[in-house]
């Protein structure tokens, strides 16, 4: 049986963590980005399908390609973030299932139903994006996830001719706490949950 993590760990991962819009001028190394992927690949996905593909943009040239896809409210915070991750999903993720889920012909579940394949890829890549956010926090990084961007532009600029489609963007770095908004409320258990 697993042991519960400490209250301090829960605070780091959830209750004290914030969504950042401003960044300190501290770089995030490529080694750190590799460290981020190491734990998130173990996060659960349907039939171990692992559809997320992540592009870490950390160069001026990469940000310039991303720039036209950003909404006005997300522009400055993205251009100043040390890293922006494009979390995409592979529309042909099922081609890896003979390796990732060798317990049956899982590939055929999805080749026979394009709708199921798309729903599965989008849903599970969204979960993997959440794992990335938690991994960032665990390694002392801050994040700013965003869905306010032109997905088609991102797909054309970064994934043309491939099977990848963008899901969301996550700015990653060391946040500038002086630029945080006041903490916003959350729904209570009674408002968000039910017991049957």
UniProtKB/Swiss-Prot annotation:
Its EC number is 1.1.1.298. InterPro entries: Nitroreductase (IPR029479), Nitroreductase-like (IPR000415), Nitroreductase_HadB/RutE (IPR050461), RutE-like (IPR023936). GO terms for biological process: nitrogen utilization; uracil catabolic process. Pfam families: Nitroreductase (PF00881). Induction: Up-regulated by the nitrogen regulatory protein C (NtrC also called GlnG) and repressed by RutR. CDD domains: RutE-like. Belongs to the nitroreductase family. HadB/RutE subfamily. This is Probable malonic semialdehyde reductase RutE.
